[in-house]
Amino acid sequence: MSFTVIIPARFASSRLPGKPLADIKGKPMIQHVFEKALQSGASRVIIATDNENVADVAKSFGAEVCMTSVNHNSGTERLAEVVEKLAIPDNEIIVNIQGDEPLIPPVIVRQVADNLAKFNVNMASLAVKIHDAEELFNPNAVKVLTDKDGYVLYFSRSVIPYDRDQFMNLQDVQKVQLSDAYLRHIGIYAYRAGFIKQYVQWAPTQLENLEKLEQLRVLYNGERIHVELAKEVPAVGVDTAEDLEKVRAILAAN
């Protein structure tokens, strides 16, 4: 099965400016992400960036690069520009890997593409089980709730589902007994290329603005998203300088 990986790589990150070029074990971070994408078996890997320095570095290690606008409000808008510029066919499967995921397992890149191909949906993603109560109550850990067949009912930063008997008068998070219903969403997506173009035509919704989760726009507009349990749990992504040091330590130990 053929699929294309697009890696958005913004230079002007508010929390860690220039992070695509941050050195990790002698390579820029974006090169680590690119190499993981290649290992997934993708037929094509494209780095989408709004920065000439990132583009030059990416070309130096052999990556295909697509220059994009600096004015996009979301990563999905950047994907849509790439799809349009490169005339990618509407039925092509596109996997979106963030440019700050140097430790992403190649197996789950392939898995999310296979997930989309197996089901009659235009968008697919992955999740992992939540075993830690602190993670469950952490708003930075996005929760996802699905039906019995893996189709998404909702994404939220809140605890879903809400266990009324346990949580109503909860005083000690450590005493929570978690059921199998709790899933953390992993921010890797597969889409049909034509659907990406459709998505950016929809106006932002109240739900996504409240939760700050753009995937809610898809559900609001009546489209389905299928989620599977990831075959491998991805390690930390890089949002901050502290995250960068963690990733450096992990790779230095290997």
Swiss-Prot record:
Q: Does the keyword Nucleotidyltransferase apply?
A: yes
Q: Name one GO biological process term.
A: lipopolysaccharide biosynthetic process
Q: Does the keyword Cytoplasm apply?
A: yes
Where does the protein end up?
Answer: Cytoplasm
Superkingdom, according to UniProt?
Bacteria
Residue ranges spanning the membrane: these are none
What pathway is it annotated to? Nucleotide-sugar biosynthesis; CMP-3-deoxy-D-manno-octulosonate biosynthesis; CMP-3-deoxy-D-manno-octulosonate from 3-deoxy-D-manno-octulosonate and CTP: step 1/1; Bacterial outer membrane biogenesis; lipopolysaccharide biosynthesis
State the Gene Ontology terms under molecular function. Answer: 3-deoxy-manno-octulosonate cytidylyltransferase activity
Q: What class of enzyme is it?
A: transferase
Cellular component annotations (GO), alphabetically ordered:
cytosol
**Known catalytic reactions:** 3-deoxy-alpha-D-manno-oct-2-ulosonate + CTP = CMP-3-deoxy-beta-D-manno-octulosonate + diphosphate
The EC number on file is 2.7.7.38
The protein's UniProt keywords, in alphabetical order, are:
Cytoplasm, Lipopolysaccharide biosynthesis, Nucleotidyltransferase, Transferase
Q: What InterPro entries has UniProt attached to this entry?
A: Cytidylyl_trans (IPR003329), KdsB (IPR004528), Nucleotide-diphossugar_trans (IPR029044)
SUPFAM superfamilies, per database record: Nucleotide-diphospho-sugar transferases
- CDD domains per the record? CMP-KDO-Synthetase
Q: What function is annotated for this protein?
A: Activates KDO (a required 8-carbon sugar) for incorporation into bacterial lipopolysaccharide in Gram-negative bacteria.
Family label: Belongs to the KdsB family.
Output this protein's name: 3-deoxy-manno-octulosonate cytidylyltransferase
